[in-house]
């Protein structure tokens, strides 16, 4: 299952190469059955979230990287430059080097959520309202479930058992740590 979400009443992310906020961080979530854990992804199409910027600003903390861009086009790790009235925006995933990829993903989310719902930024909403698209793919429509599962399980196993970079103790799949915490909490 894939879930795309956007909020057309808010803007925190500029298009790649721009400085004016147009989009939200537009999360993409996915769940894929696998062993020993399902693959669970919840990822923003921006390099960070508006919530983290706002929290760090309240707590007087800087961001871990220069993930914001000022209205003058300068990079910053200071959350005080973020949002109104300062006008700073969050960079798309990939930052300045490869932000066209996050920008493309964000455009896809905006098109699939607001485009398919027929309501979005052109209507200039003034209150929060998520536009959501849920896409469910039934693997059995393409091949027997066992074959799909064998492919995904092999991929997960190859990732978990792959050679690690120096200093890396463990390779995990998205959602693995959360599933372990859930299993521990249920004991």
Where are these regions (language model features)?
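Short, ordered loop/turn segments at secondary-structure junctions
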Residues: 6-8, 176
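Phosphate/diphosphate-binding glycine-rich loops and adjacent basic-rich segments that engage nucleotide
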Residues: 10-83
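Hydrophobic alpha-helical scaffolding
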Residues: 16, 98-101, 141-145
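Conserved active-site and cofactor/substrate-binding residues in soluble primary-metabolism enzymes
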Residues: 25, 88, 100-107, 130, ...
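Structured core elements
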Residues: 29-31, 40-42, 92, 134-136, ...
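Secondary-shell segments that build the walls of catalytic and ion/ligand-binding clefts
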Residues: 61-121
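Catalytic-core signal marking the mid-to-C-terminal active-site face
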Residues: 111, 122-187
């Amino acid at each position: 299952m894939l879930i795309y979400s956007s909020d057309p009443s808010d803007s925190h992310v500029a298009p790649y190469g721009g400085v004016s906020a147009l989009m939200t961080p537009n999360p993409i979530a996915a769940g894929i059955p696998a062993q020993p854990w399902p693959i669970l992804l919840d990822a923003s199409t921006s390099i960070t979230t508006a919530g983290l910027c706002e929290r760090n600003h309240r707590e007087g903390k800087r961001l871990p990287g220069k993930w914001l861009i000022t209205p003058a086009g300068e990079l910053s790790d200071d959350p005080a430059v973020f949002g109104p009235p300062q006008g700073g925006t969050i960079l798309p995933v990939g930052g300045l080097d490869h932000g066209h990829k996050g920008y493309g993903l964000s455009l896809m989310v905006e098109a699939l959520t607001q485009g398919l719902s027929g309501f979005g930024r052109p209507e200039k909403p003034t209150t929060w309202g998520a536009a959501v698209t849920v896409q469910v793919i039934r693997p059995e429509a393409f091949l027997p479930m066992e074959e799909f599962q064998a492919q995904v399980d092999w991929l997960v196993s190859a990732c978990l058992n792959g050679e690690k970079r120096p200093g890396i103790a463990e390779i995990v799949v998205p959602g693995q740590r959360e599933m372990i915490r859930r299993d521990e909490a249920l004991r």
